[in-house]
């Protein structure tokens, strides 16, 4: 599966324990998304377009109205990255 660089960045943050908060409009559509790292920082690369692509590919999921997290399919498709901690 082809995954863009920005999608890879977001998936990597989610694989490390991050999550995506979303805001819905009155009609139920998602208006805005914020991607948080496990440390509580906001990831600037997480735009609404990237969010929609990840959700369409079923790489992220939300269970019981909770924030979006990485799915099992997303964990299998994310490439390994070095973590400079």
Curated annotation (Swiss-Prot):
Coiled coil: none annotated. InterPro entries: YjhX_toxin. HAMAP family: UPF0386. NCBIfam families: PRK13687.1. Belongs to the UPF0386 family. This is UPF0386 protein Bind_1628.
